[in-house]
A protein has these predicted regions:
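GHKL-family ATPase ATP-binding module
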Residues: 1-200
Length: 200
């Protein structure tokens, strides 16, 4: 499991090895370096990590995304450097925007046919490594371990940021965008095939 403190330096404890390894990611690279670390050894779909940020008067958000050809999703979220293991509003905003943007782009470019159903969130997030880090004045932590962010303003801030920036990135990187949509479509087909097999 990875724990990170996202302040001036990013500290990551990687416990996947027998002996935990501590790494420090300087603020200049920040969560992009963190995502690169998590993607080490994986077959990535696009070469550069997609990064975006939002700056509001009383809140900030930084997001980094890397799609891989893997089958599991790996989403990590933070609020004021606290690892929000249970997710929360910032993570909800990220997931909603990802699904919305990939579907809109796929429809606009004819990569999803009219008769085909929209891709689900799980399809779009297959193989995705993502980090959402937000900073705000009065965080509301919920859940059993107080690691779930309850501020609804963070959902809209992250959602708006990803909706805008990811769509722009896809438009500017059509080759990578097509590969991401193809990966998501393959995940959808596998999901539907598995459902049909269960229903037999």
């Amino acid at each position: 499991e990875e724990e990170a403190k996202l302040a001036e330096a990013q500290r990551l404890i990687d416990e996947r090895e027998a002996k935990p390894v501590k790494q420090v990611f300087k603020a200049s690279g920040g969560i992009v370096d963190f995502v690169k670390h998590l993607a080490t050894g994986k077959d990535t779909i696009h070469t550069k990590v997609i990064s975006m940020e939002a700056r509001a008067p009383d809140a900030e958000a930084d997001i980094a995304l890397q799609w891989t050809n893997g089958y599991s999703e790996s989403i990590h979220s933070f609020a004021n450097t606290i690892n929000t293991h249970e997710g929360g509003m910032h993570e909800e905003g990220l997931k909603k925007a990802l699904t919305n943007v990939i579907n809109r782009y796929a429809r606009n470019k004819g990569l999803l046919k009219e008769k085909e159903e929209n891709l689900l969130g799980e399809d779009v997030r297959e193989g995705l490594i993502a980090i959402a880090s937000v900073r705000l004045r009065e965080p509301q932590f919920e859940g059993q371990t107080k690691t779930k962010l309850g501020n609804t303003t963070m959902r809209s801030l992250v959602e708006t940021t990803v909706n805008e920036h990811l769509m722009t990135w896809l438009e500017e990187h059509p080759g990578d965008a097509k590969r991401i949509v193809t990966k998501s479509s393959q995940a959808a087909k596998a999901r539907l095939a598995a459902k049909q097999a269960r229903d037999l």
